[in-house]
A protein has these predicted regions:
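A cross-kingdom feature that marks ATP-driven nucleic-acid transaction machinery
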Residues: 1-149
């Protein structure tokens, strides 16, 4: 049995307020992976999720059955993503000895002009508008099915 009085609710919401950005960032990563996998729906995905070891963390590492590798970083910040972030992700891939077919960034606030100019087959950039399009064009039961598969 748990009692929730006025004081405990005050501390709960104060604690939540401190951690809200972390929670939101985690949800943003999950939704980013969902969007990536939705866009790769014609491929057979054999593995998708975050990768980390003692030295390297990659937000999303997706591998298809034909051994195509996709790496993605999710940035829930108030800053735009610039080419420095691309270089950091490329360095992580070199250290892991992987050669992604595509590098992907998901951003809350958008991208530098330099990064936007490099967008193409090897580099995909997604903003909040892309999530809105996913929700508008996808049936909710498809999203839910993909979320729990």
């Amino acid at each position: 049995y748990f009692s929730f009085n006025h004081n405990s609710s005050f501390y709960f919401f104060k604690d939540f307020e401190k951690r809200q950005n972390g929670y939101t960032s985690l949800v943003f990563e999950e939704l980013s992976e969902l969007l990536l996998n939705y866009n790769l729906r014609d491929s057979q995905i054999i593995s998708s999720g975050s990768y980390w070891d003692a030295n390297i963390e990659i937000d999303i590492l997706t591998i298809t059955d034909n051994e195509e590798v996709y790496v993605a970083e999710c940035k829930w910040t108030n800053h735009i993503i610039n080419k420095k972030e691309l270089h950091k992700l490329n360095e992580k891939c070199k250290k892991l000895d992987i050669k992604p077919i595509q590098t992907i960034f998901f951003s809350k606030r958008g991208f530098s002009k330099e990064l936007l100019n490099n967008q193409g087959k090897d580099l995909a950039l997604y903003s909040s508008n892309d999530f809105e399009a996913l929700v508008r064009t996808t049936k909710s039961n498809e999203l839910i099915k993909d979320l729990f598969s």
